[in-house]
Regions:
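Short, low-complexity, Lys/Arg-enriched N-terminal segments of secretory-pathway carbohydrate enzymes
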Residues: 1-29, 58-70
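An acidic, glycine-rich "communication" segment
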Residues: 22-26, 176-258
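Helical hinge/lid and interdomain linker segments adjacent to catalytic or ligand-binding clefts
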Residues: 100-188, 330, 358-360
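Metal-dependent polysaccharide deacetylase catalytic core of the NodB/CE4 family, i.e.
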Residues: 153, 172-174, 182-192, 326-330, ...
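C-terminal domain-boundary segment and adjacent tail
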Residues: 297-319, 337-368, 385-387, 406, ...
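The conserved 3'-phosphoadenosine-5'-phosphosulfate
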Residues: 766-857, 861, 873-889
Length: 889
């Protein structure tokens, strides 16, 4: 060390020498400045290397390295408070587990924060703007909502008499509670009485040092006994003073004022109304959700006021992944004392989290690529291999989406597996995570294939599904029998290795730990897989500090029961909790810049269709498909070997084959920008899941639907199935099929439903319009398409904004034998659809048509209203006829 310090002194001396020379020899100013600059840069580089690489660096950082400082009675081994209460009662059986939120506007901040909290905890809710008429509150003999929330308490207090009486009656009859937030105001109130209640408020106060009422029956998730020291956020707090035994404080705080005595009684910031005054239980908040403790108290209030219907589980499972083991530049890797600290911290956490082990993700190629001291750290990890759990990262830390050759990908995985075997690392965890989550989502099929073949992977995780932000919307899915779990971030990244360089400083990190984002992530998610990196465990060891601190803080302030399990068990438990998430929803990779960076460069969103012909069946979709294919600027998908021209991706098992499979039907072309790709699948129209799936992948696609008389469509479908040899259709008359009861044999009911359900046009269109704006929907009159396809196609081109327009008049001609228009070939002949199209069937019986008129009456009436709402200037003639008493001849 003496030699290095002397070298630094020599550098300083050199600077002096250069300066002297400039003075003595009267060198030009430019040369002097250049020389001084070069020496300065050299000194900086030398000093940087000296500080980072020398033994002195560990001494420097050890002085600043943060240590967990969370202290509370629970961690000191004091007597634990009684276990969390069970809020369940028989009253919960009369209400649905749903919250009704009254907001001032749809864009108000607190209302949005309430909704986000509910979404994060997967609590169903409905938002209503206060001041309007009340929504329907009951369904038969059951209440639709378990709790009512008023973003602004005044909106409840000032509600008109009729609605207030109606709302209060509902609350009393179904034992439904109310949560209200006192709004901030420009005018400061002192001792103002709440309208109609023996409760008084003081507003616009600054407060500090919050505490909870340990005797409150509301506290379940939240643990009392501690003090949240320091000023509370904002200077517009409301405190409550009661004049009735129905009120009991839930939380207190003190005035944050120099002229206010600190020994005075604390002030109630959250108060419970037990319902002894007017028969309705309430919880009133004197501040919004900026204070982290209020978020916990709101969740507990929902649980209590709903009689347990909205209670959250208190079990939380945690897994901490350490990516990039053996990967990293020199000076960022682990040394022996870092590994010892890792083991010591793991042991302390195990006392708080049963089963906890750090989960190490390794890339074997970079083993022993550090300094001599860091290589000893690598060795020490392997000496303690049994004390951790392990997973394969990637042999060379390369992103899987960069591999176009699956064989090459498998070979690299095999190298990592062989490294594991050579060094005694377990290879049977069934878990893996790729570098930067590449290939997990958006899916790179080669990764899933290689994972199965080499590692028999059964579970992975990613932060990218459906998107990184907002974190509350991260979900899981299953693809190729591999469970993909949501992965959480903790505020630490590969470059955050020193506390003094942490963005926002230590205060920012502590804010996340002590009630902030990291704390809330664990509170809101029953299963937490966290991403960290090897570099976070060296130098200042920020990951050790972060996780030990947040776990202790959770123990201090919540009744959560923390535990840990291997990834496979976490995956199984996750999909037991959320089975509805097993089916993926494929999004558009080009709508997320992060997704584009981990998507193969050989793929392009220009391969996706610009518009969809969605059906329904037997309305002329095949004819439209044929006519569109004539257009020189329009291209359809390649035909499917199983379903002919229809891919049927969004509504069937093909969806699980993934985006790569779908895009393979739209081969890339040099003229992508000028080409209009489309897909036609007539089964999409009435598919319950199709609109959501289609919108996730193709949010800007145009939708084309063709509507015919639903009665005629039903009859045509029946005849279609007869021609194709359906035994049910051949054994039952059309009238028997459409009038079949719900007790009829299942095959008969299935045929009935396929005849009748697609004709409920308004119902299906409304589902599409809940995802797509009306401007992206074009409705074609099926009769007009049949009688005047040229004009119909010209209107469609205008809707699609295809220029220049293609003149169909010289490419379509009416064929009297077929009874419809056909394509004109180069030889001036007509090329018509096959024998299965345009068949002539016996006329429908009058009794069947009359039945269908009655059956579709409400649906057709709704369709007329919908068409008018969409701005349609003309109502189709067939729709007018179906709504009259005229019997079809």
């Amino acid at each position: 060390m003496v030699m290095k310090i002397s070298a630094v002194e020599a550098g300083v001396a050199l600077l002096g020498a250069v300066g002297s020379r400039c003075v003595v020899k009267q060198a030009t100013v430019k040369r002097c400045v250049a020389a001084l600059l070069l020496v300065s840069i050299a000194s900086i580089f030398y000093y940087t290397h000296y500080v980072i690489s020398s033994p002195l660096s560990s001494l420097i950082h050890r002085d600043t390295r943060p240590e967990p400082s969370i202290r509370c009675s629970t961690l000191r081994g004091a007597t634990r408070l009684p276990s969390a209460p069970d809020h369940r009662s028989e009253a919960r059986l009369r209400i649905d587990p749903k919250v009704l939120v009254f907001v001032e506007t749809l864009y108000s901040r607190l209302g949005r924060e309430i909704a986000e909290l509910l979404v994060y905890n997967r609590i169903k809710y409905k938002v209503e703007v206060a001041g309007k008429s009340l929504p329907v509150l009951t369904n038969l003999d059951k209440g639709r909502y378990g709790v009512l929330i008023f973003e602004n308490l005044n909106k409840y207090l000032q509600m008109d008499k009729w609605n207030r009486e109606l709302l209060d009656k509902y609350c009393r009859e179904y034992s439904v509670g109310i949560v209200g937030f006192a709004p901030p105001g420009e005018e400061s109130l002192v001792g103002a009485q709440l309208k109609g209640f023996p409760l008084f408020i003081h507003t616009n106060l600054r407060l500090k040092d919050a505490q909870l009422n340990a005797a409150s029956p509301i506290l379940r998730l939240t643990r009392s006994g501690e003090t949240a020291w320091g000023p509370l956020p904002g200077g517009d707090w409301t405190i409550f003073q009661a004049n009735h035994s129905t009120y009991e404080p839930l939380a207190w705080a003190h005035r944050d004022s120099l002229d206010y005595p600190t020994n005075k009684s604390p002030l109630a910031t959250v108060i419970q109304d037990h319902g002894r005054y007017d028969g309705i239980q309430r919880v009133l908040f004197g501040g919004g959700l900026r204070f982290w403790l209020h978020k916990l108290l709101l969740l507990d209030s929902l649980s209590y006021l709903s009689h347990g219907q909205l209670s959250l589980s208190l079990n939380r499972m945690i897994l901490v992944d350490v990516d990039d083991i053996f990967v990293g530049e020199k000076s960022t890797r682990l040394k022996r004392d870092d590994v010892m600290a890792l083991l010591a911290t793991q042991q302390r956490i195990q006392a708080l989290v049963p089963g906890f082990k750090f989960n190490l993700g390794f890339s074997g190629k970079y083993f022993h690529h550090g300094t001599a001291e860091e290589n000893l750290g690598d060795d020490m990890l392997l000496e303690n291999v049994d004390r951790f759990t392990w997973f394969s990262h990637m042999w060379n830390h390369q992103q899987p989406h960069l591999y176009e050759n699956v064989t090459h990908l498998q070979l690299d995985m095999a190298l990592n597996k062989q490294f594991a075997k050579d060094h005694g690392i377990p290879t049977v965890s069934g878990y893996s995570v790729s570098p930067h989550h590449s290939g997990v989502y958006p899916v790179h099929e080669g990764l899933y294939e290689a994972w199965k073949r080499v590692w028999n992977i059964k579970v992975t995780s990613t932060e990218e599904y459906p998107h990184l932000r907002p974190a509350r919307l991260r979900r899981g899915f299953i693809h190729r029998n591999i469970m993909v779990l949501p992965r959480q971030t903790c505020g630490l990244f590969t470059h955050t290795i020193f506390i003094e360089r942490y963005p926002g400083g230590r205060d920012k990190l502590d804010e996340s730990i002590q009630g902030g984002e990291l704390f809330q992530t664990i509170v809101y998610n029953p299963i937490n897989i966290f991403m960290t990196h090897m570099s976070n465990y060296g130098n200042d060891r920020l990951a050790l500090y972060t996780f030990e601190s947040v776990i202790k803080f959770i123990q201090c302030w919540t009744n959560l029961r923390l535990s840990s399990s291997p990834p496979l068990k976490l995956g199984e438990h996750y999909f037991q909790l959320y089975p509805e998430e097993a089916d993926p929803v494929w999004g558009n990779p080009c709508d997320d810049q992060r997704h584009q960076k981990i998507w193969s460069r050989n793929k392009t969103c220009d391969q996706l269709p610009r518009f969809l012909v969605i059906g329904p069946q037997k309305t002329g979709t095949t004819a439209l498909y044929t006519f569109l294919s004539i257009h020189p600027a329009i291209s359809s998908n390649l035909p499917s070997p199983d379903t002919f021209e229809e891919i049927q991706f969004f509504n069937g098992k093909n969806y699980y084959k993934g985006l790569d499979w779908y895009m393979s039907f739209f081969p890339a072309s040099k003229n992508e920008s000028s080409r209009y790709l489309f897909e036609k699948s007539a089964t999409y129209f009435d598919g319950e899941l199709v609109p959501r799936r289609a919108h996730a992948l193709l949010p800007r696609a145009k939708l084309i639907t063709i509507l015919l008389s639903p009665a005629r469509r039903a009859y045509s479908w029946y005849q279609h199935t007869r021609v194709h040899g359906d035994p049910v259709a051949n054994n039952y008359s059309f009238h028997s099929v459409i009038t079949a009861s719900d007790t009829a044999p299942k095959p008969l009911r299935d045929l009935r439903n396929r005849c009748l359900n697609p004709g409920k046009y308004a119902q299906h269109l409304e589902r599409w319009l809940s995802f797509y704006p009306p401007q992206q929907l074009h409705i074609i009159d099926g009769e007009q398409l049949r009688q005047n396809p040229v004009e119909t196609l010209h209107e469609l081109q205008r809707f699609l904004k295809i220029t220049p327009a293609f003149n169909y008049s010289s490419h379509l001609r009416y064929d009297p034998k077929k009874g419809f228009f056909c394509q004109v070939t180069n030889e001036d002949r007509t090329k018509c659809l096959g024998k299965s199209k345009g068949r002539q069937y016996p006329p429908m019986e009058d009794k069947s048509y009359k039945f269908l008129q009655r059956y579709y009456l409400s649906h057709n009436t709704a369709l007329v209203k919908l068409l008018k709402r969409l701005g349609s200037r003309t109502i189709p003639q067939w729709l007018k006829e179906d709504l009259t008493d005229t019997v079809m001849t």
